[in-house]
Curated annotation (Swiss-Prot):
<dbReference type="InterPro" id="IPR027417">
    <property type="entry name" value="P-loop_NTPase"/>
</dbReference>
<protein>
    <recommendedName>
        <fullName>DEAD-box ATP-dependent RNA helicase 31</fullName>
        <ecNumber>3.6.4.13</ecNumber>
    </recommendedName>
</protein>
<dbReference type="InterPro" id="IPR000629">
    <property type="entry name" value="RNA-helicase_DEAD-box_CS"/>
</dbReference>
<keyword id="KW-0378">Hydrolase</keyword>
<dbReference type="GO" id="GO:0005524">
    <property type="term" value="F:ATP binding"/>
</dbReference>
<feature type="compositionally biased region" description="Acidic residues">
    <location>
        <begin position="1"/>
        <end position="34"/>
    </location>
</feature>
<dbReference type="GO" id="GO:0016887">
    <property type="term" value="F:ATP hydrolysis activity"/>
</dbReference>
<dbReference type="GO" id="GO:0003723">
    <property type="term" value="F:RNA binding"/>
</dbReference>
<feature type="short sequence motif" description="Q motif">
    <location>
        <begin position="79"/>
        <end position="107"/>
    </location>
</feature>
<dbReference type="Pfam" id="PF00271">
    <property type="entry name" value="Helicase_C"/>
</dbReference>
<keyword id="KW-0067">ATP-binding</keyword>
<feature type="short sequence motif" description="DEAD box">
    <location>
        <begin position="241"/>
        <end position="244"/>
    </location>
</feature>
<keyword id="KW-0547">Nucleotide-binding</keyword>
<feature type="domain" description="Helicase ATP-binding">
    <location>
        <begin position="110"/>
        <end position="293"/>
    </location>
</feature>
<dbReference type="InterPro" id="IPR001650">
    <property type="entry name" value="Helicase_C-like"/>
</dbReference>
<keyword id="KW-0347">Helicase</keyword>
<comment type="similarity">
    <text>Belongs to the DEAD box helicase family.</text>
</comment>
């Protein structure tokens, strides 16, 4: 049906979807020059001394570089867990979890963390960093005096802060696995989308030495749960996972409040895929001056995205649903154990695409922030354990969530930036496995390709859509609820209105939105509430209907 051979010229070429709403995003405390170049540079001949997180010279011994994952099991190092100074019970848990050799990230970070040092680790997702910070935390708790059962408010010893519910749930599950032979140590999970009263009861009646949380819900407990602030005064280790993502989602103020509520004499671990200025500023606030910076992403190392076969397709909006259907059916026919993630721009568009693909009789699940947490947990678990399934997702699945053996990632519409493209793509090609990625753009979204021109992405020829496919997709679209189309249109309008390239020209934006409306099979663009249009700065723009 579809021929995705390379075009002749290229044949030689190798809505914000958040969980817990942040309480605010403050202006940068220092300079606003982005990037990492002033933090730590890769060593070179005759290079100047490394610059520390505080901008002061440090010895080269203070920075650890390590290799990154390659093909097969090369993401594993030769170092075994039983060579590390872990207690016998923890080692039994590691072995029961099926771990024998450390990943490169674990090899680089574990010995330093076990010494009690504050550590900022630059580490990519899918490299074993969760185990790298959990094992030392478990060791700290295991060496503390036993909890007095009669104590009304026993201290919480470890706090792990994750940007999304899925990541928090994953970290808590990993902790429970590693704690198999530490029955007296308990892990509790506090995340948005669940009843606070239930969490309060669990923390009161069950052991809670390790608390895994999303920032918004943790702040809620600090403010509303009796005795919770007192329990936090016993914290020995604070872990900020996916720190750059936490800040991208606007949780800076919440993080500052959390840090202020904890004792100063503690160990702080911060893991981040990138280390921009915002992350460095959090280090100033949360970490000791003699912190260790461990860089596990060497200059020139093979990135996850370089292992993934990448293509982009440029097509008008009215052809994109048919192209998506063809891409998926072709992939399914070629891969008996297919496992696909389709990323969409907003939660409402995600819902619409999932409904359409379901009408087309594909095996589809959807996941986004508008779904209840219990549903999201169930779907995430099902997709993780299944084959022969398509997950239509907003960006709740873009980072950190480890879905094994994903064979294809499709991105519909322009990502917000280069980093988002890479993190979405990183759901496939993990741990040395192969994978494919396809970016589906409209002609007016081609500008984005300039930001990823250094990546090994090639242009696929525009596939021909046969009449049968076109009719099948149009029929399925006709069965999609009109209300869902209206909500998707409004969300689409909001997403592209906030895009600095497309949203600048409001008249052109409305024209494109109405093109999207027609691609949904609507004769007239849906009416949008006047208040919403006013907030978008789109009132009185010709072509829009208000209500």
């Amino acid at each position: 049906m579809f021929d995705f051979g390379l075009s002749e010229d290229d044949s030689e070429l190798g809505e914000v979807d958040e969980d817990d709403g942040p309480s605010g995003f403050e202006d940068d405390l220092f300079d606003d020059e982005g990037g990492e170049k002033n933090l730590v540079e890769s060593p070179a001949k005759n290079s100047a001394p490394f610059e520390s997180i505080k901008g002061e010279p440090i010895d080269q011994e203070g920075v650890v570089h390590t290799r990154e994952s390659g093909g097969g099991d090369s993401y594993l190092s030769q170092t075994r867990f039983d060579e590390c100074s872990l207690s016998p019970l923890t080692l039994k848990g590691v072995k029961a979890a099926g771990y024998e050799r450390m990943t490169a990230v674990q090899e680089a970070t574990l010995p330093i963390i076990l010494k009690g040092k504050d550590v900022l680790a630059k580490a990519k997702t899918g490299t074993g960093k969760t185990v790298a910070f959990l094992l030392p935390a478990i060791e700290v708790v295991s060496k503390l005096p036993p909890i007095d059962c009669d104590k009304k408010r026993p201290p919480i010893s470890v706090v792990v802060v994750c940007p999304t519910r899925e990541l928090a749930d994953q970290a808590a599950a990993e902790a429970n696995k590693l704690l198999k032979f530490h029955p007296s140590i308990g892990v509790q999970l506090v995340i948005g989308g669940t009843r606070m009263a239930l969490e309060q009861k669990r923390m009161h009646t069950n052991p809670c030495q390790i608390l895994v949380a999303t920032p918004g819900r943790l702040k809620d407990h600090m403010e509303n749960t009796p005795g919770f602030a007192t329990r936090l005064m016993g914290v020995k280790v604070l872990i900020l996972d996916e720190a750059d993502r936490l800040l991208d989602m606007g949780f800076r103020t919440d993080i500052e409040r959390i840090v202020a509520a904890l004792p100063k004499q503690r160990q702080t671990l911060l893991f981040s895929a990138t280390v921009p200025d915002e992350v460095r500023q959090v280090c100033h606030i949360a970490m000791k001056r003699d912190l260790e910076f461990v860089n596990t992403v060497e200059e020139g190392s093979e990135e996850t995205h370089s292992q993934v076969k990448q293509m982009h397709v440029v097509a008008p909006l009215d052809k994109q649903f048919s192209i998506l259907y063809g891409l998926l059916t072709d992939h399914i026919s070629e891969n008996v154990d297919y496992k696909v993630i389709v990323f969409c721009t907003t939660a409402k568009v995600t819902s619409l695409v999932a409904e359409l693909l379901s009408e087309l009789k594909l095996n589809v699940r959807e996941i986004h922030s508008r779904k209840p947490q219990s549903y999201r947990t169930r779907i995430s678990k099902e997709f993780k354990e299944s084959k022969g399934l398509i997950l239509v997702s907003s960006d709740v699945s873009a980072r950190g969530v480890d879905y094994p053996n994903v064979t294809l990632v499709v991105q519909m519409g322009v990502p917000t930036d280069r980093e988002q493209y890479i993190h979405r793509l990183g759901r496939t090609g993990r741990r040395g496995n192969e994978g494919s990625g396809i970016l589906l753009l409209a002609p007016w979204e081609e500008y984005f390709l300039r930001s990823i021109k250094d990546l090994p992405i090639t242009e696929a020829t525009l596939p021909l859509i046969d009449l049968d496919t076109k009719r099948k997709v149009e029929k399925a679209l006709a069965h999609v609820e009109v209300k869902d189309k209206e909500l998707a249109y409004q969300a689409w309008l909001g997403y592209y209105n906030s895009n600095k390239f497309i949203g600048r020209d409001k008249y052109q934006l409305v024209s494109l939105a109405n093109e999207f409306s027609r691609s949904l099979g609507l004769n007239n663009p849906p009416a949008v509430p006047k208040l919403v249009l006013r907030k978008m700065g789109l009132n009185n723009i010709p072509g829009l209907r208000s209500k």
